């Protein structure tokens, strides 16, 4: 554990790799993840159908039985695994972040590296093994992704807490997700990249960040965490429980908490409720210094069978357990839902002390030992708290909420139930994906709700009539295509947010995004609203939504440009502004979008890297990425109507000209400013084209060029049109979980 190792193997993918020679090489691997070939199930396996065949109540009973079935190989604290399983579920879901929708519990990624070996996940390998008999019994009817989170819910219920509900619907993945940026640090618990002048981390064995010699050169009260991260250290879920960089400052800890929990979509009230609610149960573990702890699961020897953090202190388990290095039990009844956390937080005054592992923590002053021991019924402890717990009292805003919860236990219980439900379900997507008998009836704003269809849908004849009406408005086809793309391409495969359903492109904040060209967008929407009003006014029962018309406008324009039929399935509805959380949707705004030739790279991230990242959010494969960029360019879908990348003399026609002309060796390219390039005739020097990095990469990058050559060949036109229409239709329907998903490149996660 500690620094990144070097792979010296000369087989099985070992040795010096392309990324070692060219670390800045554009990597397309994230566009090839989670393909059917990686799954042990057949392509026909339907997880939703399997889940629906599950005896859900029997499963919950079996999970409940595990809670108090203490195993000698990993004994339960206080005879109950509830606290451990709450932490397991929390740490599965808690990796979610709002900026890109990645992380979270919806893929069961806690089973894989790096998450399975993060310092913050010490001992969760044991939690998952405790659940194996349950998973083994129910097999493919319950995914690990669902089981990890459901178990946390059942743990709360088994200790007397009434939860808000639960929804399943998370198919498992079968490989580590390589798409998420977890930070640039090379050492566990480091934060010198995310904060610039941060802590270098633990350079050897250890799970505690306790090097005081490194902590005098940065201002923990003003530092800014880099985006899209939502954790203060490499390998932590949120913040350092000892305080920022191990400094026991509750006020500064409050600042870190607000940043990290906010980036996980939680407001102050939800944050206080989650911390206090979670810390009502169980304990932390720091029986001895971290030097006693051995390798994490990914570095552990084979005979440990995927278990890590072998502990040579005492028995290495039970009272000798080491996880965070902190040794805190928060309440007098750590296996019951009580109000002790807030009662003790404000009742006692606290003084700084050290855990047996040497970590900073706090102990109550002038009181008697009242806290039970996890294994010795004759032993009592003084009340203790973490620095991050005290932040709920000493941060001014958190204190107001904490005191209100102290005085109103019912408010606290309701707030925790709702925040916990949000934590577990934030990345599950729309309700059309939710499964099971415990789905709450109350619809919550963070679900991005859309109205149900309450009218007959348009039929094929109506669609034909509507397409004619749209084209008759006089709006340029390129604008219709651009608007449809802008609406649908907000989708994010991580948290399943965005997409065309809801027509939120007409609402704040999307209607004002620069990338959506607001004047052009307003023109298109006005025309489509006219078509909608005319059709709905003339129909006695059938209605068409603006969400459907936006997509249909793109379909009509595309059919005109390509001379082929483009699939369209009605059924979208229009969300209201009241159903749209503006601050939350602001995170979906692209600052660089190579599909629409918008924005520029930064000193750290190139335009083409932003393009691949957006392609991943759209769940695209490399060929889909290439064909969509090439098609959108010749169709004139650049956000501002610019000619960058429009490598054709017949714009508005769906041709393979983009690839033909990009690959033409009669053109010599030169950089204008490192972002924009000119293509000139090699013989005459005459300027022929302009393009951006998001265009030239399709000729410069070996793998993308190989794909471009297929579409740019003399036989490539028909394939290009066919593949563009398929990829276009895929994007238009990414959020249509009410539909089957033909042609998907992988599981509909």
Curated annotation (Swiss-Prot):
Give a GO biological-process term. hydrogen peroxide catabolic process
Tell whether Hydrolase is among the UniProt keywords. Answer: no
* Chief location bin: cytoplasm
Q: Name one GO cellular component term.
A: cytosol
Q: What kind of modification does the protein receive after translation?
A: Formation of the three residue Trp-Tyr-Met cross-link is important for the catalase, but not the peroxidase activity of the enzyme.
Superkingdom of origin organism: Eukaryota
- Keyword Ubl conjugation attributed: no
Residues carrying the site annotation Transition state stabilizer: 87
| Active site, per annotation | 91
Listed cofactors: heme b
Q: What class of enzyme is it?
A: oxidoreductase
Tell me the residues linked by Tryptophyl-tyrosyl-methioninium (Tyr-Met) (with W-90).
Answer: 238-264
Give the protein family. Belongs to the peroxidase family. Peroxidase/catalase subfamily.
Reported function: Bifunctional enzyme with both catalase and broad-spectrum peroxidase activity.
Q: State the name under which the record lists this protein.
A: Catalase-peroxidase
């Amino acid at each position: 554990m500690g620094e990144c190792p070097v792979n010296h193997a000369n087989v099985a993918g070992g040795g010096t790799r392309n990324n070692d020679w060219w670390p800045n090489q554009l990597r397309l691997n994230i566009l090839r993840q989670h393909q059917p070939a990686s799954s042990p199930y057949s392509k026909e396996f339907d997880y939703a159908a399997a889940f629906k065949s599950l005896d859900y109540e029997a499963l919950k009973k079996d999970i409940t039985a595990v809670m108090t079935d203490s195993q000698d190989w990993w004994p339960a604290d206080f005879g109950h695994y509830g606290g451990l399983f709450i932490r397991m579920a929390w740490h599965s879901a808690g990796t979610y972040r709002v900026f890109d929708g990645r992380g979270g519990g919806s893929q069961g990624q806690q089973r894989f590296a790096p998450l399975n070996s993060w310092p913050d996940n010490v001992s969760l390998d044991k939690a998952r093994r405790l659940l194996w008999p349950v998973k083994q019994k129910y097999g493919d009817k319950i995914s690990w992704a669902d089981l990890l989170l459901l178990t946390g819910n059942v743990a709360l219920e088994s200790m007397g807490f009434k939860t808000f509900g639960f929804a399943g619907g998370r198919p498992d993945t079968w490989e580590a997700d390589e798409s998420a940026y977890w930070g640039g640090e090379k050492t566990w618990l480091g934060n010198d990249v995310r904060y610039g002048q941060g802590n270098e981390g633990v350079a050897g064995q250890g799970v505690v960040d306790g090097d005081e010699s490194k902590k005098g050169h940065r201002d923990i009260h003003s530092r800014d965490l880099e985006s899209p991260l939502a954790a203060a250290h490499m390998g932590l879920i949120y913040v350092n429980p000892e305080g920022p960089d191990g400094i026991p400052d509750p006020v500064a800890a409050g600042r870190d908490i607000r940043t990290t929990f906010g980036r996980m979509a939680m407001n102050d009230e939800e944050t206080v409720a989650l911390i206090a609610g979670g810390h009502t149960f169980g304990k932390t573990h720091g029986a001895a210094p971290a030097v006693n702890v051995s390798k994490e699961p990914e570095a552990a020897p084979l005979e440990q069978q995927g278990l890590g953090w072998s502990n040579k202190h005492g028995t290495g388990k039970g009272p000798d357990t080491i996880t965070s290095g902190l040794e805190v039990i928060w309440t007098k009844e750590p296996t019951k839902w009580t109000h002790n956390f807030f009662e003790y937080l404000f009742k006692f005054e606290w003084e700084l002390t050290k855990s047996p592992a040497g970590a900073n923590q706090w102990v109550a002053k002038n009181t008697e030992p009242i806290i039970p021991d996890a294994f010795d019924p004759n032993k009592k402890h003084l009340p203790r708290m973490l620095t991050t717990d005290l932040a709920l009292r000493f941060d001014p805003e958190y204190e107001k909420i904490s005191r209100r919860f102290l005085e109103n236990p019912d408010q606290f219980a309701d707030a925790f139930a709702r925040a916990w439900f949000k934590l577990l379900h934030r990345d599950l997507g729309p309700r059309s994906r939710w499964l099971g008998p415990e789905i709450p009836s109350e619809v919550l704003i963070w679900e991005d709700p859309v109205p149900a269809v309450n009218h007959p849908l348009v039929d094929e004849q109506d669609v034909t009539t509507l397409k004619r009406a749209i084209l008759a408005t006089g709006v340029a086809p390129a604008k219709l295509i651009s608007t449809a793309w802008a609406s649908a391409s907000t989708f994010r495969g991580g948290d399943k947010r965005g997409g065309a359903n809801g027509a939120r492109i007409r609402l704040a904040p999307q209607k004002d995004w620069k990338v959506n060209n607001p004047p052009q967008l307003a023109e298109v929407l006005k025309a489509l609203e006219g078509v909608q009003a005319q059709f709905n006014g003339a129909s006695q029962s059938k209605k068409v939504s603006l969400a459907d018309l936006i997509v249909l406008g793109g379909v009509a324009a595309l059919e005109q440009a390509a001379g082929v039929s483009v699939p369209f399935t009605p059924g979208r509805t229009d969300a209201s502004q009241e159903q749209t959380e503006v601050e939350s949707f602001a995170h979906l705004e692209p600052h660089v979008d190579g599909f629409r030739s918008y924005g520029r790279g930064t000193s750290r991230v190139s335009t083409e890297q932003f393009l691949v990242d957006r392609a991943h959010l759209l769940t695209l494969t490399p060929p889909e990425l290439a064909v969509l960029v090439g098609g959108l360019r010749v169709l004139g879908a650049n956000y501002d109507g610019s000619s960058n990348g429009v490598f054709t003399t017949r714009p508005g026609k769906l041709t393979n000209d983009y690839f033909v002309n990009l690959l033409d060796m009669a053109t010599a390219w030169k950089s204008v400013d490192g972002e924009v390039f000119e293509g000139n005739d090699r013989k005459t020097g005459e300027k022929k084209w302009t393009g951006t990095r998001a265009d030239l990469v399709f000729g410069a990058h070996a793998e993308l060029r190989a794909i471009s050559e297929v579409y740019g060949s003399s036989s490539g036109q028909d394939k290009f049109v066919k593949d563009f229409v398929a990829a276009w239709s895929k994007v238009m329907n990414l959020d249509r979980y009410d539909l089957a998903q033909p042609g998907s490149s992988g599981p509909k996660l």
